[in-house]
Curated annotation (Swiss-Prot):
Record-given protein name: Probable GTP-binding protein EngB
Binding site residues for GTP: 32-39, 59-63, 77-80, 144-147, 176-178
Lineage: Bacteria, Pseudomonadati, Pseudomonadota, Gammaproteobacteria, Candidatus Pseudothioglobaceae
Ranges of residues in domain EngB-type G: 24-197
GO biological process: division septum assembly
Residues where Mg(2+) binds: 39, 61
Superkingdom of source: Bacteria
Key words, A-Z: Cell cycle, Cell division, GTP-binding, Magnesium, Metal-binding, Nucleotide-binding, Septation
C-alpha cells in the first residue's frame, strides 16, 4: 500500500462543481448508493477511522468531499445516491451535479464504484457505470460488506457481477470488507494505476 493513502487529509467540501479545487492533477472518485459503505472504504484505505464521516443515516454525504493525498492527487467522496431520505429536488440536484462532474472534470482519472454485496447493481449503480463507460473512464467495482455473506454466497455474487461487466473494457470487480480488511491490497494496486504511483 502506497504511503500517500495513509497521509490523506481533508481538503474541502462543496455543494456543487463551482466550489471544487482547480481542475488539475489527478482525482479518483468514490461513488455509491447511500449506505453502500463508501466512507468506510475510504477510512480503511487511509487507516484513518474518522477521515470520512460514517453515518447510519442514508444520504449523509450531500457534498463533494475532497481528500488530499499530495499536492497533485485527491480522493473525492461523491454524494450518496439512491434511497437517501432527502427531498426529490435534492436528489435531482445530486444527479445533475454528479453528471456534470463526470463530463466536465478533466483531472478525473478513475472511479471506485462501491456496492453493497447484498444489493449489487441497482439502477443508480448502472447509471454511474454508464457515465464512466461513455468517457472511457477506468472503474473499480468494490463489493463491500463481503463479510456479511458466507464465502460461497459472496463468490457467487462476485461471479455474477463479473459476468455483467464483461461488456465494459475498463471495469474490474473485487470483494471488500472494511471489517476484515479484505481486498485492501487489490484496491491499493488499482488506485496506484489511476494515480500514477509506482511502488
Amino acid at each position: 500500500m502506497h504511503k500517500h493513502y495513509h497521509q490523506a487529509k481533508f481538503l474541502l467540501s462543496c455543494p456543487s462543481l463551482k466550489g471544487c479545487p482547480p481542475d488539475e492533477g489527478y482525482e479518483v472518485i468514490f461513488a455509491g448508493r447511500s449506505n453502500a459503505g463508501k466512507s468506510s472504504v475510504i477510512n480503511t484505505l487511509t487507516l484513518q477511522n474518522k477521515l470520512a464521516k460514517v453515518s447510519r443515516t442514508p444520504g449523509k454525504t450531500q457534498h463533494f468531499v475532497f481528500f488530499e493525498l499530495d499536492k497533485d492527487r485527491r480522493l473525492v467522496d461523491l454524494p450518496g445516491y439512491g434511497y437517501a431520505k432527502v427531498p426529490k429536488r435534492v436528489k435531482t440536484k445530486w444527479h445533475k451535479d454528479i453528471n456534470e462532474y463526470f463530463n466536465k472534470r478533466d483531472c478525473l482519472r478513475g472511479t471506485v464504484l462501491v456496492m453493497d454485496i447484498r444489493h449489487p447493481f441497482k439502477l443508480f449503480d448502472q447509471m454511474v457505470l454508464n457515465w464512466c463507460h461513455s468517457i472511457n473512464l477506468s472503474t473499480q467495482i468494490i463489493l463491500t460488506k463481503s463479510d456479511k455473506l458466507k464465502k460461497g454466497a459472496a463468490s457467487n455474487t462476485y461471479l455474477k457481477v463479473h459476468n455483467q461487466i464483461k461488456k465494459y473494457p475498463y471495469v474490474d470487480v473485487q470483494l471488500f470488507s472494511s471489517l476484515k480488511k479484505q481486498g485492501l491490497e487489490i484496491l491499493g494496486a488499482r488506485l496506484n494505476t489511476f494515480f500514477g504511483y509506482v511502488d
